[in-house]
Amino acid sequence: MTMTGGHHHDAHHEDFQLKDTNPLLGEQWPKGAAGPARPAVGGGIAGWLGLEKPSSTYDLVEQMFFLYVRVVKAKDLPPNPITGSPMDPYVEVKLGNYKGTTKHYDRRANPEWDQVFAFSKSRVQSNVLEVYLKDKEMLGRDDYVGRVVFDLAEVPTRVPPDSPLAPQWYRLEERRVGGGGDGGGLKVRGELMLAVWIGTQADEAFPEAWHSDAATVRGEGVASVRSKAYVSPKLWYLRVNVIEAQDVQPQARGRAPEVFVKAQVGNQILKTSVVAAPTLNPRWNEDLVFVVAEPFEEQLLLTVEDRVTPRKDDLLGRAALPLALFEKRLDHRPFVQSRWFDLEKFGIGGAIEGETRRELRFASRVHVRACLEGAYHVMDESTMYISDTRPTARQLWKPPVGVLEVGILGAAGLQPMKNRDGRGTTDAYCVAKYGQKWVRTRTMLGTFSPTWNEQYTWEVFDPCTVITIGVFDNNHLGNGNGNGNNAGGGGGGSPPARDARVGKIRIRLSTLETDRVYTHAYPLIVLQPSGVKKMGELRLAVRFTCLSLMNMVHLYTQPLLPRMHYLHPFTVTQLDALRYQAMGIVAARLGRAEPPLRREVVEYMLDVESHMWSMRRSKANFFRAVSLFSGAAAAARWFADVCHWKNVATTALVHVLLLILVWYPELILPTVFLYMFMIGLWNYRRRPRHPPHMDTKMSWAEAVHPDELDEEFDTFPTSRQQDVVYMRYDRLRSVAGRIQTVVGDMATQGERLQSLLGWRDPRATCLFVVFCLVAAVVLYVTPFRVVALVAGLYLLRHPRFRSRLPAVPSNFFRRLPSRADSML
């Protein structure tokens, strides 16, 4: 949507602001509190909150209570009464209207499940828990075998760090005639090992449990709704220094080969320059750098090729080298030993056997120096939002300086992301990424105000880093198809479903005060082809705890990245290419986890498209620069007013200050630093109280033109109509022309400065040289204080003594030549 509406603009912008929240954090165990289904007198589920418990480490989330049921195994089950063979048992756990079932086993008398069910207290409408054992193959009749009944008022409470509750054996009983729910039926053959307790989301069983909130999810979708933690693969830079090759034999005799080496690791391909080899021993001495991940599954494939024509390359030999062959370098000093590798022949030589094949195989070889660089930090995210700066090798890591704790409380006001059963809905989950650790909350189904209340912790090795938290809509809920309940799925020929972006936020740790809990609702803002849109709010509780203040302060004096990035830096082009290769590896590895963290999620969190051209971003960056220099411009205007005596009192005070500084020059630097100290103290009262958040106004998202938005969302290469592309190209040429003019003017001024002593204009240079000689003599015989005083008084002279024409130095400088005259 385009930002219009006049007086509604301020209210609309206010909707994008950060909001304070006051959640009730930490564990709450009020004595004698009742659940929603507590009877009027005794019984019921009052026992859920009838005990006072000590607080645990989950103090940044609102306490949530669950009834946990662990179904471990069964024994001594009766056979099928019809066939006489062992039954196909499964267990059904029923609490009110909620039912959860284990998988069934074929013909098993002593099955083992070890499955946990979790029922949310807020949705329980019963005071009795029933656990049924059933036979799946008893068709056409009641498959009921036996049950175990629990009164919720008698269920014990358990919260970490308490030890896990030990499961017990329970005899199965018959269902009482009349449907009574309080147990007491006749005992039947068979026993179930169960553990039933009241716990919170801090329980160890919480992440892997079946949740009543996701009772409608079946099959493969069950795994995709659970909370999970992931670890990024350990990435290394593989540096391959291709030195030379020996005895390279071209396939076509009588010509000097033009040889290059192509190196490939996985889908990464790099080539050396093409070198003419009249002596058949070409030399390159070029570095090729790749990104590889542990465990090293790929090989380094080196191929030597001959550039016959611009479109034809002949393969002369190859060598396949396992990555484990190369040593790991942890510093810039150790010398890596180079090695010769034999090249295996291709073409005709590849089909020859015996001695001839061995001769061909060892006829050519390549000289390589390769190592795995462990002293670099492998970039897999945008450098502006980096979350980790540690080198690859663990031996080089410093101790952590702090701990970051994030409580993901919930969201509010989410927008419908798809249609299900004829109405809009959202199945939201959160992903948080900091350092090598990724976390994913459970999916809350069919709600626009999901409540997660999950807390996660990260070690902090550098406070000048950023945590990224994103919200996504889960489109992989199973139900027998690949796209779950995604409304855009379509037929069988539709592309695979993708988890839709709801929005994300970033928090820079250095902007947080230590040991303070920040509880805010962050706006989830996304830019769509129709304009900027608020997708809801994400409620977080964040705390940054300092472990060592001295180490943290010391970090501010250290380089942001490891030493190798400065001793042996990569080029900007190399870093960009390596970053995208690292992103691809991380996305591929996390996509192979179970449940997978999907590629579209990883790419959105890592800002894979942050380099793409955007007129909106260009405008935003331009106005950021304008805002940056606005203070200097204001100071220049104030000084011009002082020089022109706009305010006589101010000009008089400046004269007094000039006299003091001229006669006491030793006060200049102390005055400057004391002034900055006082400004810092004055600004302390107005220091930012909240973490920064997405600013739609600064991002130029509220006033962006619809066509510029459409261009930003265009594919690469473009997929728009030809006339639209022509129009955008002309617009880009217009913008680039203005930039070209500004850059040319800057170059002209610099070249005029160079020409002062360059004798390109002999008269101007002669005048300047004579002026320098006179100035040297005058400044030598005149005290510095007198010179400074005269210069200051001349600069502050009254307008009566000023001319409206440009000054003599300006006239002289503008007449100097530049190289603009030599441009075509």
Curated annotation (Swiss-Prot):
Major place of residence: endoplasmic reticulum
Compartments it resides in: Endoplasmic reticulum membrane
A matching Pfam family: PRT_C
PROSITE patterns registered for this protein in UniProt: C2
Membrane topology summary: Multi-pass membrane protein
GO biological process: one example: positive regulation of flower development
Nucleus in keyword set: no
GO cellular component, one term: endoplasmic reticulum membrane
Disruption outcome: Delayed flowering phenotype under long day conditions.
InterPro entries found in the cross-reference section: C2_dom, C2_domain_sf, C2B_MCTP_PRT_plant, C2C_MCTP_PRT_plant, C2D_MCTP_PRT_plant, MCTP_C, QUIRKY-like
Tissue specificity: Specifically expressed in the phloem including companion cells.
C2 domain ranges (all copies): 48-170, 217-341, 385-522
Transmembrane segments: 625-645, 657-677, 764-784
Keywords of the record: Endoplasmic reticulum, Flowering, Membrane, Repeat, Transmembrane, Transmembrane helix
PANTHER family, alphabetized: MULTIPLE C2 DOMAIN AND TRANSMEMBRANE REGION PROTEIN 2 (PTHR31425:SF24), PHOSPHORIBOSYLANTHRANILATE TRANSFERASE ISOFORM 1 (PTHR31425)
Annotated family: Belongs to the MCTP family.
Chain's role: Involved in the export of the long day-specific flower-promoting signal (florigen) RFT1 from the phloem companion cells to sieve elements. Promotes flowering under long days through the transport of RFT1 from the leaves to the shoot apical meristem (SAM).
Assembly behavior: Interacts with RFT1 and PI4KG4.
Name assigned to this protein: FT-interacting protein 1
